[in-house]
Amino acid sequence: MSRPLAQAIGEIEKRLRSAGRLSLFLDFDGTLVPLGPDPSAIRLDPATRETLKRISRKGSIATTVISGRAIDDLYMRVGHVEGIVYAGNHGLQIFGRGMYFVEPTAAARSSELCRMSSALVEKLKPFMGAFVEFKGLTTAIHFRITPEENVQQIGTVVRDTIATNPECFQLKSGSKVLEIVPRTNWNKGAAVRWINRRLGDGEILSIYIGDDNTDEDAFRELPDSITVKVGDPAGTLARYQAPDPDAVHDFLLRLTDCELSRSAGH
């Protein structure tokens, strides 16, 4: 059972001060920024961006922003922060700090996914508020502002569409969104492992903060690390729980202060 982050901050700071290097992973929507009815309207607020810049200037902290958004979209909303790694499409795309990766199975199936997404655009036109977002390697079907009585029908339409190619694609559910993703062993946990291996030799303490079902793969990958579920902690593998993005920002400020005192002590 996860513990409230605010109650555990003392023990967390003790671990941070004794760690050699830190690898910080942050989900975007619902973690760094609040969820909203229109994903295209969401931006990282200046205060949080400035905090990320302060953290990224610390040579002993490697920061990754990881999201289900397409990597270009993620980069545009976070903005350029020197030293940050950007991981889009749930880690299927990665770049930053000299790293570059595109998951090959997802890349090979992009054209077929594009055709499937175009078909869904037509099929979902009757449902008010539902829209399809093709993200290159994955596709999201958003229904945050769709009347509740239509949600089940939307799910049926999407599942029937995927059923035409079940060996290549699978469906994942999030907060008021369904995602069509390629069948591959790659997920956010695999992305975390890939990034950490490229940060060099030596012991690394990972911190992962996320709010989505897809973040559970990362929590599973990091059983001995500092893992934080944002929002409802029911069923999570994370050690700690934070109520909202404001609490995440407060934690990041504490992390910055902790790193400053740690650096002063070395």
Predicted regions and their residues:
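Asp-based phosphoryl-transfer active-site loop
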Residues: 17-37, 65, 192
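Short amphipathic alpha-helices and their capping/turn segments at secondary-structure boundaries
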Residues: 4-20, 73-80
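Active-site phosphate-binding/coordination module
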Residues: 43-134
